[in-house]
Amino acid sequence: MNKDLLLSSYDYTLANELIANYPANPKEDARLLVFDRKNKEIFHTTFKNLKDFLPDCAIFFNDTKVIKARIYGNKASGGKIELFLHQPFLNSHNPLFLAQIKGRVKKDEILYFKEDLKARVVELLDDGLRKVQFFQNDKTLDTSNLYNLLDKIGHIPLPPYIKREDEKSDLKDYQSIFAKNLGAVAAPTASLHFSETMFENLRKKHKIYHLTLHVGAGTFKGVECENIQEHKMHSEFFNIPQQACEIIDSKQAILGVGTTVTRTIEYYARTKTKSGFCDLFLHPQNPPIRQNHLLTNFHLPKSTLIMLVSAFIGREQCLKLYKLAIKEKYRFYSYGDAMLIL
């Protein structure tokens, strides 16, 4: 079988010390590895110098906002519970939500949280997932009311590879400066590097466009089948404003800031769907057909994200750059350094 289709072909070894537990401070002091595909040139610089490398292009950002999706509570017996909200079921008659619950629960069990918030376990699903309904003062909560309450009592859901509790600084650090549409349970991390000043400077030279893709917990779900074509990609809600669609439909060169932007642009390029659910899986055998350039962080081995990067530059080239980044002590994952692919 073609090595590009084998899960084991996307593996690499990373020392724990290279996993960033906190972002660079200031954020634009993060390092930036630039790879120019045309000339096969590699540059090592800092993120604040990004503008010096950008060609004439429109820049697309994901303006999703991370929910405080992790809450701690108790069962009626007093046993402790941790609930991680994933997403609402949009088509259900009653407001129901998909959640992951740490701790054994039964169908119809009631869980208790701060601010008189209660959750009823409606259904036990596979992979430790649960369908739940939320109440406050015996009134069923819809998405908007629940998100407002989570803003008071919830915690920012840091990724599983950040081995610490969330802190006050994460409220700002794990949210992009242009985040406005509430609904993600993970940040579009390439966006986290941008300060207000840097963003405004970019605006002076480039047309900026926003789209929304609510990053789901599926972004952390590993690929389990050796033949990656058998992987079932998670589905995430997206919305693209008309103005942004017109740019995608044009011949204007596009830089996508982050893998979520890339998947949304490429889904639209294939389907002409402006709003809905994106489950596009990009890899070397299913490469991008529209987006020209990519700004992204360094991703987990064997993840759909490293496969997406490989779709742009080839698997072998991707692994070579990752090997170089490790040698040069770049910081990896959500709070880590960035890579620009031209």
Curated annotation (Swiss-Prot):
Residues annotated as transmembrane: none
Alphabetized SUPFAM superfamilies for the sequence: QueA-like
Locations listed in the record: Cytoplasm
EC number of this enzyme: 2.4.99.17
Enzyme class: transferase
Catalytic activity reported: 7-aminomethyl-7-carbaguanosine(34) in tRNA + S-adenosyl-L-methionine = epoxyqueuosine(34) in tRNA + adenine + L-methionine + 2 H(+)
GO biological-process terms attached to the record: queuosine biosynthetic process; tRNA wobble guanine modification
Keywords carried by this UniProt record: Cytoplasm, Queuosine biosynthesis, S-adenosyl-L-methionine, Transferase
Cytoplasm in keyword set: yes
Pathway, per record: tRNA modification; tRNA-queuosine biosynthesis
Cellular component GO terms, alphabetical: cytoplasm
GO molecular function terms listed in the Swiss-Prot or TrEMBL record: S-adenosylmethionine:tRNA ribosyltransferase-isomerase activity
InterPro entries: QueA (IPR003699), QueA_dom1 (IPR042118), QueA_dom2 (IPR042119), QueA_sf (IPR036100)
Self-association and partners: Monomer.
Function: Transfers and isomerizes the ribose moiety from AdoMet to the 7-aminomethyl group of 7-deazaguanine (preQ1-tRNA) to give epoxyqueuosine (oQ-tRNA).
Cross-referenced NCBIfam families: PRK00147.1 (NF001140), queA (TIGR00113)
Family note: Belongs to the QueA family.
Name recorded for this polypeptide: S-adenosylmethionine:tRNA ribosyltransferase-isomerase
Native organism: Campylobacter jejuni subsp. jejuni serotype O:23/36 (strain 81-176)
Lineage of source species: Bacteria, Pseudomonadati, Campylobacterota, Epsilonproteobacteria, Campylobacterales
